[in-house]
Amino acid sequence: NTTVSTLLAEKLGVPMINFTFRQMAVERNMDFWDFCALANRDDNIDRELDRRQVEMAMAQENCVLGSRLAIWMLKDADFKVYLMASDMERARRIFKREGGSLEERLNQTRERDGHDTERYGRIYGIDNNDTSEADLVIDTEGKTPQMIVDMIIAALPKNC
């Protein structure tokens, strides 16, 4: 998501907003997975992250917001894109970026998804598996970031 968001923002000549759990973990000098476990116990972490992202996006005339919840958080966005990939594909990407074992990354990905789905439902009443809020849903499996950006650009309405 970050790579696609960055490339898309560059292509459109607009800022890219992408404040993430990883960045919050770094701010707090915490391991990412420990921070995720903390977020599962403290709903204020999600609220802070999402508030900060929305504030950053609203401060821009136009931007690309790279966020797991962007299609639900920015109701008035001109165009909402949801990128999806299988658990295995996402685990492969994390493994390539961070190392470890692929099996461990797959288990962590599935565990995180389960916790995220439960948390988003509890905090916001959002079913993050329901992509009906999106204008465009792309299965990223087997596609390069540039291919995905090209698909988004092709689907953008003329007024965006």
Q: Over which residues does each language-model region extend?
A:
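ATP-dependent small-molecule kinase phosphotransfer cores
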Residues: 15-74, 88, 99-107, 114
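Glycine-rich phosphate-binding P-loop
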Residues: 1-8
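Acidic donor-binding loop at a coil-to-helix junction in glycosyltransferase catalytic cores
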Residues: 90-95
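Short loop/helix-cap segments at secondary-structure boundaries that form the rim of catalytic
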Residues: 71-77, 129-132
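C-terminal alpha-helix
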Residues: 151-159
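Small-molecule kinase domains that catalyze NTP-dependent phosphoryl transfer to phosphate-bearing small molecules
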Residues: 102-151
